[in-house]
Amino acid sequence: MLKEYEDSLYNASLVDGRVELLYIDEEPEVEEEAVIVEVEPAADSVATPTDADAVAKLMNGERADLVFTDPPYGMNLDTDYSSMQSKLAIADEKHLKGGNKYDAGHVDDFTPDMVQAVLNLDAKETFIWGADYFAELIPNRNDGSFIVWDKRANESGTIEQDESSDKMFGSCFELCWSKAKHKRDIARVKWAGIFGMEQEPDRKRVHPTQKPIALVAWFLNRYGKEGDIVVDLFGGSGSTMIACEQLGRKCRMMELDPHYCTVIIARWEKLTGQKAIKLNP
């Protein structure tokens, strides 16, 4: 099932200002049933975010301080890798289907109840990626603000002209909606799109819309504090959990797809050297 990751899964995390590669050398066993896994001080759940009981079980009576999430809009992408096959050895065929072009606006798989599930957490700070594609689904969206992620610039603001994949696939920036009315800001985190971060080797990624851990760290450091309970109801690649582990936050994460929930757990285990504990559903 995880044949796409036969060489090893990876991501980069920010450790003392440097990038550390995280490798997963073996294929983890996929958990098909809904479970909650304790990866102290975090929790990872295979369940749907629209199930209020499942979310309540995940939170275990605690309240979210900050929500950072990237909902599954556009997962049925219409994508053609034919011109880049020499660079893209293997695509995640489960979620990236062959076609003509990348269509980030394809949001058939995203529904209003998913947005409401995030807002129901009632966190002081809530950040939702891709909301510019489904803004009409967000109630009172004008009460919030948008933050720009500039993928081409480093922290000093210098734009580096290179051959990053986002010149061919996707865009050089993304927008994140904030529930709070923050001042206009730009997260400058260098990213080479589908090929990974500049510091990473040209390897396969673990998720089609994966966010770099350095980007998650940018938000957690600016809008949160150590010890915060951070919630991500659409865990995806698990970058939010890894950033929380690095920065002393408590993560509560949910992922609908058992495949990616397994990847998240494997990444956490590789980073910490600890073993996740499966709790009763």
Question: What does each model-found stretch correspond to?
Answer:
Residues A43-V46, D53-T69, Y73, L77-K101, ...:
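Class I S-adenosyl-L-methionine
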